[in-house]
Each structure stands twice: as structure tokens, then as C-alpha cells.
């Protein structure tokens, strides 16, 4: 069963479909290899087939779905090589962001990050994976913005769904508490302005969940 969020004010039908489908693909409510039922999804989303098909074409270009003429449309399987490319890009950028954070972040910036981390405990206790995932995304987005690199974040975010699926799957084989501890260690290194430790911890944090998800 897919989850459908409310349509935003002034959001086009295509953008709405795109956002909802990406969210459900990332969170594996639409599973890898699953066939999309166009008439049913159009009815659930309250849109006509034209914007739905426009969204499908964009998802196909982003390699999140596969359109098979006269057969159907399927959620793409996880492509290990593509995930590794995205992981490598993120690792390079985010290790540099972690190093920059040691230099640039103010006490107020660091407090914002600690506020994010503080919420993890509640959602870990409730085993709410999607909330934890949102906090994880929010933590990294904050770091990019605080370091003055929002364009870097946009670059990564465009490719993120491929990597994000492995992050969600990693929660099934790696306790969320471990990822929480990664964030605590990274934030402590940033707070202490330890560039070497922050760089190293960021690389480990990005690499381990992907490896576990792909071998599970």
C-alpha cells in the first residue's frame, strides 16, 4: 500500500505524482521489480493519465522505473554499480563538508545539529524507520547549507533516490542506533574542530550502510 501525502499549494499534477512515486520507491512501499498499476495509481492520486505518464517518463530518465513497451512499467531493481557511483560522489563531497564544518560552523549551527540528533532516540525507541530516515536526510542537508554549499546538496539530491533505497534497506540489517552513534561521533569531531577525525568518520558513515544493504 502506497502512502500519499497532501498535494502542495500550486504544485502541478506532474510534480505531485513525481514526488509521491519517488517517496514510495525510496521507502520501498513500491518494491524493486514491482509493476505499477497505472489506472489504480491515477485514481488514488486523483490525476489524469497525462501527468502520470509525464512523471513516468522523468522517472525512467532517472532510472527509477523501467518502461517495457506493451508489457508494463516496473520499479527498477537496485543497480549496485549505480549505487556505488552515487555513494562515491557523496563520500567525496560529504567528507569535504565534514572537514569544512570544523572550520565554519558556529555554536548556533552545532546546536541545530544536536537538536536533530536528539530526536533520533524517540524514533529509534518507536522503530519508526521513515522518521529516522527523514532525520538522517535533514542532518546532512543542514551540514551542506551551514557550510555554504547548497548547490552541492542539490547535486547529490538529484541522484539520491538510488542511494536512499539502500539506506532504507540497511535499517533491516544495521540497527538505527548505530547510525545515530555515527552522527554523534561525527558531530563531536566537528565540535572539537578535529578535521582529520570528521573526514574519516564521514567516509565510514556513508560507506557502511550501502555495503550492508547490497550484500543482504
Segments and roles (model prediction):
Residues 59, 120-123, 213:
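Signal-transduction coiled-coil helices of two-component systems
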Amino acid at each position: 500500500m502506497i502512502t500519499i501525502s497532501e498535494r502542495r499549494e500550486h504544485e502541478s499534477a506532474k510534480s505531485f505524482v513525481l514526488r509521491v512515486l519517488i517517496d514510495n520507491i525510496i521507502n520501498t512501499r513500491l518494491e524493486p521489480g514491482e509493476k505499477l498499476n497505472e489506472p489504480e495509481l491515477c485514481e488514488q492520486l486523483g490525476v489524469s493519465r497525462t501527468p502520470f505518464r509525464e512523471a513516468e517518463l522523468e522517472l525512467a530518465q532517472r532510472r527509477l522505473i523501467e518502461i517495457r513497451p506493451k508489457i508494463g512499467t516496473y520499479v527498477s531493481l537496485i543497480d549496485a554499480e549505480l549505487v556505488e557511483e552515487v555513494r562515491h560522489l557523496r563520500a567525496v563531497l560529504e567528507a569535504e563538508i565534514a572537514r569544512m564544518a570544523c572550520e565554519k560552523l558556529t555554536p548556533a549551527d552545532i546546536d541545530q545539529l544536536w537538536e536533530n540528533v536528539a530526536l533520533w532516540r524517540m524514533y529509534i525507541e518507536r522503530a519508526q524507520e521513515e522518521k529516522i530516515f527523514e532525520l538522517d536526510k535533514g542532518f546532512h542537508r543542514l551540514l551542506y547549507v551551514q557550510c555554504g554549499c547548497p548547490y552541492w546538496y542539490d547535486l547529490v539530491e538529484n541522484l539520491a533516490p538510488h542511494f536512499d533505497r539502500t539506506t532504507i534497506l540497511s535499517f533491516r540489517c544495521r540497527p538505527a542506533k548505530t547510525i545515530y552513534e555515527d552522527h554523534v561521533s561525527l558531530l563531536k569531531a566537528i565540535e572539537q574542530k578535529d578535521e582529520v577525525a570528521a573526514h574519516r568518520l564521514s567516509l565510514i558513515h556513508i560507506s557502511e550502510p550501502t555495503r550492508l544493504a547490497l550484500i543482504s
